């Protein structure tokens, strides 16, 4: 039922673009919208999320992370995200802001 099929393991566009790779960063492959194993991860002081779709996967995981780690700084780089439509992208960003998730590069 995905409105836009994306990030399907092993297909073109699944890997992190070389320009976005950060040395020492942790990359997590998740099988569905919201990943339920965040609590098993160790984070120093901040998490930055990017990806497709802002209004499905990004917002789901940002909210899960905020619930699991309420004091951890969680940032979403809006310039590295896209929604199904421009309006749903914007709505997802607003939802995350209301839940104390930092949005940069709008």
Question: Predicted regions span which residues?
Answer:
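Active-site-adjacent betaalpha module
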Residues: 2-106
